[in-house]
Every structure is written in C-alpha cells, then in structure tokens.
C-alpha cells in the first residue's frame, strides 16, 4: 500500500508557474539601477500590507482609523476609572440633598456636575484602590505597546503608500474604487519592472495569494480535517461548537508566530518539524508549550474578562437602546467563516459571499420559529404594548408624568419587551419552503454537509446550521466566556492532539520555489488532495487521510480559477476543469432547452423577478433554484435532482465570453473558459469610472458563475454518493503517543471497523450500508506531473480503511503495519533527509 507518513516535500516548477529553464533563476540587477522595491525580503508582510491598505481605502483612512482605535482604548479605561472613583451616586440617585440656595424652602435643581467629586477627592480615591492601580498600570503598558506598534506601522505603511503611487501608479483618491484584481494585475506587471522577488522572473496570482494567506490556509485545512478541538458534547446541550477570537488568537500564537512556534519566520517551517525522526520529542515540546500558554491565559483571565465586559457594554449598549432587536439578529459565526472559506480566498471575497447568503439564511432560520414561543410572544407583546400605550398617552396629556419615579424606566423596559417579542413573531405572509432556501444558501456559501440535502425541514439540520449562523447574542456571550473557557480548551483538549498536529505540518507542508513553505492543500491539486466523489475519480491518488473533506479542493480550485482567469493551473487541475466543462456541456445539451433562453417561462420565476429588487445574477440563481420545481408533475427525488442538475448545466452553458467594450446585457461572461485575459480589469470607453463600473459588474457575474458551479458540483456529488453509499471520510481519534503500531488483524486488540461519518465537520454516528463502488467519472486519467519519482505511491480505488497511530491507514483484511519502512523516532535526523520532489 502507499506510504502516507510522507516527509516534507519541495515542489518546484509545477506550482511556481515559472517559465521553462527559470525555476532556479536568481535575477541580478546592477547596483545603480535598483529600485526601492527591488528584492523585498519579507514578501509575506509586504503583500499583506498592500492588501490591508487597499481594504482600508487608502493611507489617510487607515491612519485615522488607527488613531481612533488608540483613543477608543484610552477612553474605555479613563471613562471606567471616572465612573468608579469620581462620581457621587448618592447625589445622582437623589439619596442626598444638595442646596445651592440661601433659602432652604426654595426648590432646588440638581445638575450633573453636582454628582462629580472634586479632583482632589477623586485622586485620593484612586490612590487608595490598589486593584484599580494595578489594572491601570497594566492598561498603560498595553497602550504604550500599541502606541509604539502604531508608530512603526505608520512608517511601514508610508512605504506601501509610496509603492502605490510610484510603482503601481494608483493615487490614493482612486484606491477605494479599484478592485483587488486590478491592484493584483499591476503587482504582477510591476514584478517585471522592479523585480520585487528575485527568485522568479514573473509572479502569478497564486504566488500573491499564498504569501497573504499562508497561515490562513493552514487554519482552513486544520478545521477541514477536524484537528482543532472545536466541537464539544455538553450535558443538556448536546453537541456545541466553541470558536472565539480569543481561542483563534491562541491557536495562531502557538502554531505560527508566537515565541517557540513551529515556524522559523513568516515563510519557513523549522527544519526539525520537516523530519519524522523526532516527532514524539517535538510533540512533547509542543504539549508543554500549550500547557504554559494555557496557564498564562488562566492567570490573565480576570483582566481579559473585565476588558471583554467593558468593551461589549460600551460597544452594544447604544445599539441595544437604538435597536433592541439587534441581539435577536444573526451573524456568521467564526467557525462558520473558517468552515465555509475556500483555500486561497481573501477576506473580502469571503465576506462578499457571506453577505449574499445572509438574507436567505435569515429567512431559512425564521422558518423554524416555535409555535409555542410565537404564541407567548404575541400575548407578551399585547400586554406590554397595552401598558406602554397608556403611559405614552398620559405623557402626551401631561409631561409631568415623566417626573414620577420609575416611569421613564418602565416605558423603556416595556418598549424593549415589545421589540423583543415582535422578533419572535413570524411574518404572516411567509411561505414555508426550507428546501429552496437551503439551495439558495448553498449557491452562495458553497459548502454544506451531505445529510442536509433533502432534510432542510428537520430540526437537526436547523441546529447544525445554527452553528454556522448564530444569534448575535450568542456570539457576544461566547466572547465574554472566552477568557474562562480558552485555558481549559488549551490545557485539556488541544494538548492531547499535539502529536497529530506535528504529523499534520510535516505531511501537509511543501516548499514552493519563490514562495516558501505552504500548506499542500493550498496548491488545490486534485491529484494530491482530490476526493473521488467530487468529480476527481480517476484523477486523484490521494488516500482517505490526504483527501480534503466536503469537496474543499475541487470547489477551491473552481473558485480560484473563476476569480483569477489569467492564472494557468497545473496540468491535472486543467484537466479537471476541462472535464467539468465537458460534463456541463453534456448535461446542458441533454436538458433539451432552447439556446435563446435560460429556462422556459413559468409563473413562479416571473413573480420572483417582478417582486425582487435583486441584481440580474441573483435573479438568475433564483430562476435556477425555482425552475425545476415549477415544471411538470411532481417527480421522485432522484428525477428532481437530475432535472435540477440539467437546469444548472443549461444556465452555465448560456454563459458567453464578454468582449472588451461590450456592455453586459442579459448574458453572463465566461471567466473560466475565456482567453485567459481578465476581462474584469479591462476598461471600456475613455472614462475611468466606466471601467471601474464594468469591473464591478463583471465581478458580480463571476460570483454568479461560481454559485452555479457550486450547485452543479453538489448535485453531481449527491448523485455519485447515492450510487456509492459508503463515503470514505477521514475522522481523527486521539493520538497514540506511544508510537506503537496498530494491532494485527485477528489479534487480541483487533477492533471492528468504526462507522464512517458522512461529514468530517458534521459527524453522524449512523453508518451507511455498503454498496459496490462506481467507476471513475473520467476513467483512464492517470497522468501525473512529469518527472516525479515516487514509487511508494500507487493509485488504487478507495476501500475500507482502519486507522493507524501515525494518521496513516491500512486496508481491512491486511496487517495494519504503520510504515512499509519504519521511521526511527530518535537520533535519525541525519539519516532522514527531506524527500525532494523534482518537477
């Protein structure tokens, strides 16, 4: 069988996209002709700052935003200290009388300054409070640290400001109206003039994405392979997901950039983590480091908790007063953002997708309001509203009613109660259609567990989707609990997985020429990490351990190819995209639809287009989703799936390339199958504004094309899964740190095969019945990168596997040996050089 405990790999030209003969090129430029941006050493940080400056709309906006962040921190600390030590609450609450008049019988008005203590008294109370002094000292040190960091960042971003002006020739006034694709295209062109990277003559879009998203790609892969402890089963609550900003910060601190982390710098993994000889020692070292960071979090817990409470209060108090139903609104959870993120997807691209899916996601969750809760909310709103109406009427009649004690408080609380109750009352005109809503959501978020399809009306699906799309109040509560829960997760949940994390970084890290060490999943190579049930059958050599779950490799490749049409993918990826295009053409032709229109006219689609104020691409998605349910008599689920697949394929076939200067009218431009020129960066006419407008419109059509491809690929995957019910999904178990091999079959320690869950991110304990495996979609496709010599890798059909201690797999019915050749665990660093893969 194949050897899955691979060593660190160095990949060259196939991923660097360098011209032939320039793989190891080192460009030399005469000293006098060097530009200020020649040979930038830390390109990761440089490209990240270029991207951040673009997202923050220029240097001035970024500078003012940073200044306000410093002032905001200073205000929170100073204002809290003032409220604690400098206010006489007895006067404020009228428990103590203040008389400014010489005649005691005269009425007295208490002003706000009367409740403020004198400066001397305030200072004395602060000095007497030792706990407050300690907190102020720590806050002052932290603020000075942020101030120094702010000054340093301003100096660095001024250099980026000059880079935009002189190298990219983009003025700051025009930067907010330039898309990232336009900036990226100019960076690629600037490389030819200034040689930003001396290891390559030309930069590609993938090189830039790799440097900006190096650590983010690792995080997406860790979540995809379920290696981070994010799911917990609690008594009375069932399975919950806990992933907060504080926990994510600690993960990144431990793994990527903190002292003693796995990385030597931003672009290079430490040499000892690239070899398998010291894996147990490295795992123990990582475990100890996690323990100490967990203890540090525990000691700092009171301070962090106080800051979280104060920041949440000052941030959301005004919002809650102005819009009491805001906490009843929903937002995408941090886990959802990581689970739904493609490999090599920038933050603004992810945010754009999630924003498009917000409305249908909200409508879907509103379909599941409890009838009992709705009944209670209606009656609660009636009683609270009645009392509120009487108080408001009395106030209108005589405003002195507000002077009565607690009247204003009662009015405020009753108003909040009415608003909260209304948020639990559904719209009386709403139609319950969860399946169509879930399909629209899938068109935008692109990822969804298999067992959700066809079960959108079930409460289990709703509860699992709520882990991705949670209440804003739940998000705030998790952030408040994070300082308490994070140390427990680090010490008791993350430490036992130290060995698996060490193996993950060794097995899934490759060195790309001109880029450095990157996550191998970020290469989007269907041969290395494709899944046979996601159109990669016959094209992938990946084991179950190496496969990305939920079609992450295939969908990420499609997304990147559509977003960056000028990018030239490797040979296997090109073959995959070509095969998908052929499949779309076949299914679209089989649909028997007219070439002039996307779908036949139907009443539901006409009403959707007449009632919606959406853009044309979103109306197209609504057309595709609604089309298959509006034509003909009711069909079985399989026939409905085939019809839906044909509808999507027909919509994709209708896409035609948009020529420069042609306005998009009724046609969607093809960005994946075009000539390789990014039409979104082309300007039509002499006006810059026209070019920018066309760029935005074409970007919208590109996102629509990706949405249709996501629907189409999920439908193909569903049909293939039904033909082959047993899906082979890698799911982790606790590491065997002893390093012993798995028991032989028939031995005392032999175990029955564990049930395979349907989704690594949403595990299900119910196993599927076995079935014969289907043939490959693209049989006979066994091409590999020329020049790769890996005799240990043998392509074979998927079969049942049992887990090995190192994360490898053995076929059922065979002895479960851990390695074809045992890897020594100590003292073998010199005998185990990294395996170099030449391309």
Curated annotation (Swiss-Prot):
Stored Pfam families: ATG9 (PF04109)
GO molecular function terms listed in the Swiss-Prot or TrEMBL record: phospholipid scramblase activity
Superkingdom of origin: Eukaryota
Record-listed Phosphoserine modification sites: 14, 16, 18, 656, 735, 738, 741, 828
Reported modifications of this chain: Ufmylated in a DDRGK1 dependent manner.
Catalytic activity: a 1,2-diacyl-sn-glycero-3-phosphocholine(in) = a 1,2-diacyl-sn-glycero-3-phosphocholine(out); a 1,2-diacyl-sn-glycero-3-phospho-L-serine(in) = a 1,2-diacyl-sn-glycero-3-phospho-L-serine(out); a 1,2-diacyl-sn-glycero-3-phosphoethanolamine(in) = a 1,2-diacyl-sn-glycero-3-phosphoethanolamine(out)
Region (Disordered): 656-689, 717-839
An individual GO BP term: protein localization to phagophore assembly site
Record's compositionally biased regions (Acidic residues): 737-747, 823-832
Residue stretches of biased makeup (Basic and acidic residues): 724-736
Motif (Tyrosine-based sorting signal): 8-11
Subunit structure: Homotrimer; forms a homotrimer with a central pore that forms a path between the two membrane leaflets. Interacts (via cytoplasmic its C-terminus) with ATG2A. Interacts with SUPT20H. Interacts (via the tyrosine-based sorting signal motif) with AP4M1; promoting association with the AP-4 complex. Interacts with ARFIP1 and ARFIP2. Interacts with PI4K2A and PI4KB. Interacts with ATG4A; the interaction is direct and promotes ATG9A trafficking.
Entry note about domains: Forms a homotrimer with a solvated central pore, which is connected laterally to the cytosol through the cavity within each protomer. Acts as a lipid scramblase that uses its central pore to function: the central pore opens laterally to accommodate lipid headgroups, thereby enabling lipid flipping and redistribution of lipids added to the outer leaflet of ATG9A-containing vesicles, thereby enabling growth into autophagosomes. The tyrosine-based sorting signal motif, also named YXX-psi motif, promotes interaction with the AP-4 complex.
Protein name per its UniProtKB record: Autophagy-related protein 9A
Species: Rattus norvegicus (Rat)
